[in-house]
């Protein structure tokens, strides 16, 4: 799993771990970093099958995604971190707080739930990726993420590019993990 540490690189520094959403990379958080206070350690990582992380054959499970997050934290000697999770990143944070409470002091969860959608929704999304590719999926995702007026601005281009360039195998693998979570 590919991760990056920004800010203070010391285990005793207050730590924030960021886990991103399906189809995105750790670059998702880049505009947030300058807004954070000095003196903290910031850990971002690419989910399994995303960005610079390995892309193993799927399907993946939520347990694997949670174990990946734990491995990132263990490798950086994290204890007592604030975990910020967006969408599937929030699902991972919830699981990590249950399985490894030694790692988590606080959770910040956005656009997430204990279960997102149903099996049919994820089966349809997987089929759409196989049939139409990631560029078509990115169009669908942008329409869901952004309002119509904002979606037609150049500010959306980096987001569109991020999802369009996601590896289909990794995207589908994480879709399966979300579908299998209850």
Regions found by a protein language model. Name each.
Residues 20-22, 81, 85-87:
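Conserved alpha/beta-hydrolase "nucleophile elbow" surrounding the catalytic nucleophile
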Residues 117-120, 131-182:
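Conserved alpha/beta-hydrolase catalytic His-Asp/Glu region
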Residues 46, 82, 105-108:
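Residue in the alpha/beta-hydrolase core beta-strand immediately N-terminal to the catalytic nucleophile
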Residues 2-58:
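Conserved HGGG/HGGXW glycine-rich cap/lid loop of the alpha/beta-hydrolase fold
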Residues 63-81:
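Conserved acidic catalytic loop of the alpha/beta-hydrolase fold
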Residues 65, 83-85, 110:
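Short beta-strand immediately N-terminal to the catalytic nucleophile in serine-hydrolase-like folds
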Residues 12, 38, 77-80, 101-102:
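Active-site acidic short loop of glycosyltransferases
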Residues 91-99, 103-139:
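Flexible "cap/lid" loop of the alpha/beta hydrolase fold
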């Amino acid at each position: 799993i590919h991760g990056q540490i920004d800010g203070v690189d010391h285990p005793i520094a207050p730590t924030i771990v960021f886990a991103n959403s399906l189809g995105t990379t750790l670059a998702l958080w880049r505009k947030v970093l300058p807004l954070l206070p000095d003196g903290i350690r910031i850990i971002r990582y690419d989910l399994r099958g995303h960005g610079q992380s390995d892309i193993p054959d799927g399907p993946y499970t939520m347990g694997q995604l949670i174990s990946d997050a734990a491995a990132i934290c263990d490798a950086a000697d994290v204890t007592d971190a604030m975990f910020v999770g967006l969408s599937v990143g929030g699902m991972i944070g919830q699981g990590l707080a249950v399985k490894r409470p030694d790692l988590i002091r606080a959770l910040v969860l956005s656009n997430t739930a204990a279960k997102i959608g149903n099996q049919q929704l994820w089966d349809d999304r997987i089929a759409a990726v196989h049939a139409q590719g990631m560029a078509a999926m990115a169009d669908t995702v942008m329409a869901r993420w952004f309002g119509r007026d904002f979606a037609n601005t150049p500010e959306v281009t980096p987001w569109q590019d991020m999802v369009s360039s996601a590896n289909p195998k990794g995207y589908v693998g994480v879709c399966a993990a979300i579908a299998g979570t209850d």
